[in-house]
C-alpha cells in the first residue's frame, strides 16, 4: 500500500523543561586545508532550543602549582575562518514525571540524660520593700517612774525560715552562647504531595491513510421482471426536437454492504517474548493442610565445630566439716613466701558527702601531664538555624594549577551539526599608522603689503607648546609578515594603580577539599586550668599476675618417726605475708565503670606554669566561621534547587570594563551522537588558492554586551563534609593583591525545577559567652586516672587581619605581536556577572523548523546570583538525642535584675522573747483634761 500524503503540521507544543547538561565534547584536530576568506555576516539567527546538559564531572584533585612557563615567541596572525551554518532548531522535550514519594525514616531512640549542671551563683539581694503605712497615734501615757536597768535577757531562738518569695522578673537576656555542633542529618522528610498533572502535549500529526480493503464479491442476480403489456400503436414519428438542457449530476449511490468474510490468512510469524508483567497482588492464604507424616531420619551430619566455652557452674553446697586432725610436723622456719593475694572487690561507692565550707584557693599546683584525648562525641541534635551571615569578601585568586597531562587522542566522532553563530570577538589591535596624506593645494597668493619699519630684535621667546595632533591618515597597506624578532627583555613592573572601589560581596564559593595540615605553629600560652573532672569509678579488678619465683628452700627438719595417721589439725593462723614476687605483665584493661557522682566544682586555682605541648587532641568540633579562603576546585554539582521567586527587573547597570581573556579550557570528552537522522554528507568544494594577505582592517567597534542569562535558581545546600583533622597553626600569610577579574562566561543553562530541599545546615557558630565567676570549691576527688575528658569547646575566632591594599593599576603597555598558540591551560575562574541588559522586544513566531541534530553542550556558565531563600521545608522527625555535653564553665555574675513585684505578705512571725528593759523615755506631752 502507498502511504498517504503527510498531514498539516500541528500547533506548536509547549516548551518542555530543559534537559540535563550533556558532557563536554573533545576538541577535534585542526583541519589540513587552507583557511578561506571570511564571508559576509549573515542574518542574525534565532536561538535554538537548549541542548541537554551533561552530568557534572567529578572534581579532580588539585595538583601542586607548576613552574611558570616561559613566554612564547610571537606568532604570525592567522586568517579568519569561515562562518558556520546555522543549526536546526530541536523539538520540544516531553515533561518529566515526578519521582516517587520517600518513605519516612524511623524515629531515633532518646539519648541518655546529661550530667547535673554546676551549682548556680547566689542571687543578689533584692531591693528593700516599701514602707508600710503609719499607725494611729497612741494615747499619751502617764509618766512612769524611772526604772532600774534590768539584766540582759537571753538571746531569742532563731525564728523560722520565712516563706519563699515569688520569683523576680526575668533578668536581661545574657549573651548568646556558642552555637551547637552541627547535628546529624535529619530523617528524610515526609513524602511530598503529588505534583500537578502535566500540560497536555501537542496533538500528533495525522497518520497515513491505511491500505484499501479487498473488493467484495458480486451480489446474487436479482429476480427477473415481469413482461410488460404491449402498448398501443404509436403515432407517426415526430421530428426530433432540440436537445434539452443538461441535467444535474445525480447523487452518489449508497455504499454497498460489505461482502462475506474472506478465508483466514496464513499464520503470522511468532512474536517475540513480551515484557515482564507487574507482580500480582498476594493471593488469599489457603486453608492449612493436614500435618504430614514424620519423615525418616536423615543421614548423620558432619561433626560440628567445638562449641564456645560454657559458663562456670554454680558453686556447690559446702561440704561437711572434717574431723579435727592431729597437729602436723613443724614446717621450715622461715616458711616459703606465699603468693600475692588477689585484690579484693571494689567497695560500694560511699554516700555523697555534703558540700564543705568554701575553702580558700589552694597553692598553685604543678603542671599536670596532658590527659589522653577523649573520644569524639556523638553529634548532638541540630542546633537552631542561626541568622544568615554576611557574604564574605571575595578571596584572592588562587594560583593557576599545573597543566594536566596530554590526553590520548580520542576516536573521531560523527560529524556534528553546525554550531551557533559565535559572539563577536574582541577588538583587534590598532592598525599601523598610515602614511601622511598628500599636501593640500596651495592657496592663492595675496597682495603684497607695505613693508614696515624694521624694529629692534625682541628677546627670545619661550619654547612653544606642542601643536595639535594631525588628522589620522588612511590605513596603509599591510606589509608582508616579518620574521619574528628576538624575545625582548621583561619590562619593569608598572606603577601601582590607585585603590579600586571595593567590589560587591561575591557569592560564597563551594567548600574546597580539606588541605594538608599546615606547619606546626608556635606553642600558645597555656590556658587556665579548668575545673577538675568528676572522679572516675574504681577500675575493675585486673587479671592476677604471674606467680613469683619460689623462694630458697629452708633447712630440713629432723626426721621423726612415722606417726600414725592423726586427726586433721585445726586451721592454723594465717602466716606472715611472703616476699613480693616480680611484677607480672600488665593485665588487660578492665571495662570502664559507670561514672561516679559529680562533685562540686572547686574554686579555680592560680594560673599554673606553662606546660609542655601535649599530644595532638582528637578532632574537635568545627570552629567559628573563618575568613573566606581562596576558591577551591569545583565540587560536585548539587541537585537543582527549588525555583526561586522571580526577581525584580533591575535598572541597566554601568557598562563594565572588559576583563583580560581567560585561559583556554581543557579539552572535554567527546559528546554522544545527537538524536535525529544523519544527514547526507555534502559535496566537498574545491580548495581555493590561498589569497594574498589583505590590508590591515580598521579595528571593529566593540560588540554589544549580550543579555545576561536569567537569574539562576538557588541549589540545595551541600551536605556538610566530614570534618578533617585540625591543621597546626601556621604563620599568618601576607594579604595578597586582588587578581584581575576573569572573562565573563556564556550564560549557563537553567536546570529543571527540583523538589524542595532539606533544611539547611546550621549557621555559623556564635561568639563565646562571657567568662563566669568561679564556683564554690568542690570536694577533693579520688586520685587515679580519670575517664577521657570531653572535647573542649572551640576557641574564639582570631581577629581578622587588615585587608591588603589593592595595588595601583599599571598603564596598559603597547600590544605585542600575537604569539603562537600555547598548550591548553586550565579553565580560568568565572568572571563577574555583567550588567543586566534591557529586555528585547518579542519577535514574531517563526515557522516550526525541522528537527535538527543534537548540538554540542555549551560551556558551563558562571554561577548565577543566589536566588531568594525559599520557604523552609517541613521539619523532619526529631533525631536521636545526643550524648550529654560536658559541664560548661560557670558564667559571670549577671547584672542585678529589675526589682520584682512586691510579694504577698508573709506569715506572721513568732513573738520574740522579751528584751531587756530599756531606759526611761522622755516625758510625754500633758494629756487632755478629764471629764468633770
Curated annotation (Swiss-Prot):
Q: In which tissues is it expressed?
A: Expressed in bone.
Q: Which residues form a coiled coil?
A: none
Q: Which UniProt keywords apply?
A: Extinct organism protein, Extracellular matrix, Glycoprotein, Hydroxylation, Phosphoprotein, Secreted
Locate the Phosphoserine modifications and list their residues. 89, 532
Which residues in this protein are found as 5-hydroxylysine? Answer: 83, 224, 288, 496, 607, 777, 839, 851
Q: How is it modified after translation?
A: Contains mostly 4-hydroxyproline. Proline residues at the third position of the tripeptide repeating unit (G-X-Y) are hydroxylated in some or all of the chains.
Q: Name one Pfam family in it.
A: Collagen
4-hydroxyproline modification sites are 15, 18, 21, 30, 44, 59, 65, 74, 80, 110, 128, 137, 140, 167, 170, 182, 188, 197, 203, 206, 221, 230, 233, 243, 258, 264, 273, 279, 297, 306, 312, 318, 327, 330, 334, 343, 349, 361, 370, 379, 382, 400, 418, 424, 430, 436, 448, 457, 469, 475, 484, 502, 517, 523, 544, 550, 553, 562, 568, 586, 595, 604, 616, 622, 631, 640, 643, 664, 673, 681, 690, 708, 717, 720, 726, 741, 747, 753, 762, 768, 788, 791, 794, 863, 866, 884, 899, 905, 920, 923, 926, 929, 932
Q: Tell me the protein family, please.
A: Belongs to the fibrillar collagen family.
Entries under PANTHER family matching the protein: COLLAGEN ALPHA-1(XXIII) CHAIN, SI:CH211-266K2.1
Designated name of the protein: Collagen alpha-1(I) chain
Amino acid at each position: 500500500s502507498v502511504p498517504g500524503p503527510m498531514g498539516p503540521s500541528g500547533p506548536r507544543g509547549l516548551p518542555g523543561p530543559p534537559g540535563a547538561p550533556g558532557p563536554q565534547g573533545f576538541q577535534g584536530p585542526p583541519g589540513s586545508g587552507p583557511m578561506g576568506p571570511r564571508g559576509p555576516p549573515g542574518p542574525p539567527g534565532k536561538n535554538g532550543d537548549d541542548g541537554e546538559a551533561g552530568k557534572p564531572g567529578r572534581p579532580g584533585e588539585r595538583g601542586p602549582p607548576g613552574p611558570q612557563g616561559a613566554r612564547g615567541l610571537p606568532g604570525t596572525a592567522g586568517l579568519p575562518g569561515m562562518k558556520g551554518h546555522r543549526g536546526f532548531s530541536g523539538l520540544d522535550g516531553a515533561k518529566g514525571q515526578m519521582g516517587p514519594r520517600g518513605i519516612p525514616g524511623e524515629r531515633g531512640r532518646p539519648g541518655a540524660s546529661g550530667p547535673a549542671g554546676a551549682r548556680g551563683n547566689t542571687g543578689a539581694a533584692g531591693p528593700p520593700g516599701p514602707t508600710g503605712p503609719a499607725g494611729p497615734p497612741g494615747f499619751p501615757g502617764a509618766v512612769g517612774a524611772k526604772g532600774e536597768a534590768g539584766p540582759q535577757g537571753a538571746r531569742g531562738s532563731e525564728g523560722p525560715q520565712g516563706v519563699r518569695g515569688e520569683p523576680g522578673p526575668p533578668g536581661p537576656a545574657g549573651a548568646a552562647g556558642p552555637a551547637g555542633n552541627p547535628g546529624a542529618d535529619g530523617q528524610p522528610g515526609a513524602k511530598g504531595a503529588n505534583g500537578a498533572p502535566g500540560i497536555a502535549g501537542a496533538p500528533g500529526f495525522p497518520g497515513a491513510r491505511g491500505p484499501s480493503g479487498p473488493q467484495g464479491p458480486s451480489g446474487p442476480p436479482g429476480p427477473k421482471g415481469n413482461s410488460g403489456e404491449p402498448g398501443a400503436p404509436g403515432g407517426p414519428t415526430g421530428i426530433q426536437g432540440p436537445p434539452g438542457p443538461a441535467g444535474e449530476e445525480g447523487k452518489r449511490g449508497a455504499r454497498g454492504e460489505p461482502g462475506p468474510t474472506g478465508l483466514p490468512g496464513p499464520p503470522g510469524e511468532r512474536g517475540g517474548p513480551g515484557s515482564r508483567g507487574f507482580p500480582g497482588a498476594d493471593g488469599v492464604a489457603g486453608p492449612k493442610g493436614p500435618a504430614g507424616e514424620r519423615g525418616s531420619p536423615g543421614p548423620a551430619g558432619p561433626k560440628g565445630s567445638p562449641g564456645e566455652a560454657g559458663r562456670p557452674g554454680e558453686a556447690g553446697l559446702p561440704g561437711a566439716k572434717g574431723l579435727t586432725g592431729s597437729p602436723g610436723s613443724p614446717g621450715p622456719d622461715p616458711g616459703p613466701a606465699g603468693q600475692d593475694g588477689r585484690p579484693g572487690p571494689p567497695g560500694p561507692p560511699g554516700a555523697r558527702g555534703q558540700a564543705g565550707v568554701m575553702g580558700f584557693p589552694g597553692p598553685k599546683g604543678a603542671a599536670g601531664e596532658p590527659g589522653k584525648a577523649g573520644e569524639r562525641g556523638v553529634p548532638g541534635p541540630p542546633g537552631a538555624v542561626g541568622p544568615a551571615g554576611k557574604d564574605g569578601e571575595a578571596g584572592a585568586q588562587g594560583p593557576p594549577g599545573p597543566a594536566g597531562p596530554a590526553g590520548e587522542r580520542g576516536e573521531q566522532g560523527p560529524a556534528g551539526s553546525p554550531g551557533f553563530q559565535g559572539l563577536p570577538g574582541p577588538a583587534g589591535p590598532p592598525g599601523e599608522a598610515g602614511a601622511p596624506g598628500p599636501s593640500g593645494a596651495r592657496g592663492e597668493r595675496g597682495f603684497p603689503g607695505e613693508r614696515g619699519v624694521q624694529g629692534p630684535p625682541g628677546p627670545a621667546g619661550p619654547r612653544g607648546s606642542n601643536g595639535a595632533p594631525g588628522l589620522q591618515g588612511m590605513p596603509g597597506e599591510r606589509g608582508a609578515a616579518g620574521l619574528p624578532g628576538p624575545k625582548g627583555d621583561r619590562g619593569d613592573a608598572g606603577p601601582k594603580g590607585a585603590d579600586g572601589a571595593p567590589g560587591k560581596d561575591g557569592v560564597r564559593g563551594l567548600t574546597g577539599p580539606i588541605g594538608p595540615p599546615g606547619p606546626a605553629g608556635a606553642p600558645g600560652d597555656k590556658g587556665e586550668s579548668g575545673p577538675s573532672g568528676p572522679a572516675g569509678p574504681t577500675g575493675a579488678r585486673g587479671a592476677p599476675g604471674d606467680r613469683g619465683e619460689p623462694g630458697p628452700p629452708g633447712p630440713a627438719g629432723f626426721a621423726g618417726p612415722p606417726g600414725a595417721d592423726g586427726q586433721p589439725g585445726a586451721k592454723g593462723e594465717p602466716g606472715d605475708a611472703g616476699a613480693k614476687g616480680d611484677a607480672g605483665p600488665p593485665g588487660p584493661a578492665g571495662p570502664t565503670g559507670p561514672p561516679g557522682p559529680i562533685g562540686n566544682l572547686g574554686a579555680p586555682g592560680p594560673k599554673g606554669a606553662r606546660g609542655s605541648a601535649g599530644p595532638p587532641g582528637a578532632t574537635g568540633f568545627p570552629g567559628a566561621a573563618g575568613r573566606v579562603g581562596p576558591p577551591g576546585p569545583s565540587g560536585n554539582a548539587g541537585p537543582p534547587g527549588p525555583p526561586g521567586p522571580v526577581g525584580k527587573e533591575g535598572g541597566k547597570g554601568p557598562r563594565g570594563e572588559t576583563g583580560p581573556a581567560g585561559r583556554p579550557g581543557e579539552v572535554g570528552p567527546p559528546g554522544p551522537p545527537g538524536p535525529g537522522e544523519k544527514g547526507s554528507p555534502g559535496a566537498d568544494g574545491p580548495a581555493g588558492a590561498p589569497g594574498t594577505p589583505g590590508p590591515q582592517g580598521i579595528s571593529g567597534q566593540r560588540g554589544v554586551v549580550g543579555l545576561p542569562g536569567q537569574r539562576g535558581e538557588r541549589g540545595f545546600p551541600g551536605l556538610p563534609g566530614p570534618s578533617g583533622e585540625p591543621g597546626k597553626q601556621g604563620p599568618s600569610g601576607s594579604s595578597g593583591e586582588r587578581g584581575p577579574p576573569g572573562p565573563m562566561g556564556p550564560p549557563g543553562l537553567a536546570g529543571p525545577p527540583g523538589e524542595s530541599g532539606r533544611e539547611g545546615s546550621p549557621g555559623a557558630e556564635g561568639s563565646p559567652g562571657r567568662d563566669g565567676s568561679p564556683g564554690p570549691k568542690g570536694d577533693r576527688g579520688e586520685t587515679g586516672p580519670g575517664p577521657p575528658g570531653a572535647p573542649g569547646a572551640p576557641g574564639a575566632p582570631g581577629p581578622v587581619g587588615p585587608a591588603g591594599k589593592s595595588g595601583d593599576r599599571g598603564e596598559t603597555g603597547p600590544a605585542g605581536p600575537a604569539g603562537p598558540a600555547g598548550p591548553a591551560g586550565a579553565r580560568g575562574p568565572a568572571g563577574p556577572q555583567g550588567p543586566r541588559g534591557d529586555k528585547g522586544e518579542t519577535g514574531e513566531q517563526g515557522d516550526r523548523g525541522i528537527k535538527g541534530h543534537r548540538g554540542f553542550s555549551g560551556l558551563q556558565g558562571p554561577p548565577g546570583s543566589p536566588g531568594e531563600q525559599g520557604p523552609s521545608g517541613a521539619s523532619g522527625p526529631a533525631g536521636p538525642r545526643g550524648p550529654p555535653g560536658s559541664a560548661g564553665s560557670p558564667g559571670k555574675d549577671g547584672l542585678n535584675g529589675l526589682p520584682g513585684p512586691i510579694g504577698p505578705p508573709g506569715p506572721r512571725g513568732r513573738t520574740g522573747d522579751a528584751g531587756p528593759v530599756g531606759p526611761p523615755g522622755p516625758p510625754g506631752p500633758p494629756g487632755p483634761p478629764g471629764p468633770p
